[in-house]
Amino acid sequence: NGKVLRKQLVKDLHEQYFAITKGEEIVEYKARRSMLLVPSYNKHNVEKARTVLADTLIFDLEAILEDQRELARETLKDIYKEGGAKFGESERVLRVNNLGSEDLKKDLALAKEIELDALLFSKIDTKEDVLEAVKLIEGINPNLTLMIMIETPLSVLNIQEICAASSKVEVVVVGSNKLANRLQIDIKRGSKAIVTYLAHIALAAKAYGKTVIDGPHFDVKDEFACEDSTKDAFNLGFDGKSLVHPIQIEYINDIFTPKQSEVEDYEDMINKYEEANKHGKEVILHNNRLVDSSRIAWARKMIKLYETYKALGQNLFGK
C-alpha cells in the first residue's frame, strides 16, 4: 500500500538525522521538504493535521486575525488535551507573533504548556532580533529548534548578518507573500518575480549552514504553477517549501526527493572522480561538466537521501 509506505517514510525521517559525509565533515540533515501552515483557530484543520504526510506542521498564531489568536491558543491546548501531543510523525512547530508584542508573551506561555519540536519567530529583521529570539527560546526550552521568518525588504537586506548572528538558528523560512506585498509585486502565479531576493536569502542561509524553506504557493487549484514554483525553489538551493493545503504535499515532497536516474548518474560520477583522484586529479569532466570535490559532496548527500527513502518505499514517487 503506497500510502502506508509513505507514512512509514515520514515516521523514519523524524526518528533520525542523516549523517552525510561532506569531505571529512559530517553534516546532519533533517527532512523538511514540506512544511504545512495550519491556521490554529480552526479545530478541524488542526485535527486533520494529525493525518497528513507533511514533514513539518506549523501551528500558525501569527497569520490570522488578531481577534482569532486567543481562540487559536485555546484550540491548540484543547486538541493536545483531547488527542495527545502526537501529530503522526510530523515535526511540530509553533509560529509565534512579532517580537515585543503582547501576543508573543501569550504565545510563549502556550509553548511552555504543549509539547513542541520548534518555535518559528515571525518578522526577524536584524541580528538583534535574532539574539532576542535566542534569549526567549533558551528561557522556554533550550532543546527546541529555533526557526525564523524572513518577510520584509529590511530582512532581505540584512540576511547575511541575520544568518551569522547565532548558530542556534537552524531554519530560515521565507514569508514570500508578505515580502512581495511590501515590494508591491504580484506573485499569484508564482515566485519568479522575486527570484533575485529568494536567491539572496538562499545564498546567505547556505553560507551559514542553515536549512532554508521557500514560501507557499497560495493558489491550491493551480497544481502546475505550484510545481513550477517548487522546482524554482529547488533549483535555487532551498531545502523545502511551506504550503497552505495538504493537496500540495505529495508533489512538493517528490520534487525535493532524489530520483533513481539522478542517483545512477551520481554513482558513476563518484566512481570516475575517485579513480581520477588516485592519479592526482582533483577535477574531472563528467557528461561535459566539470566536477570537483564540492559536487562530489553534493552527490553523496543525494545518494544517502535516496537510499534512505528507497528503503522505505520512496521509489513509489517515481523515477
Label for each model-derived stretch:
Residues 1-26:
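AMP-binding adenylation
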Residues 26-319:
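Expand to "…catalyze enediolate/carbanion chemistry for C-C bond making/breaking, isomerization
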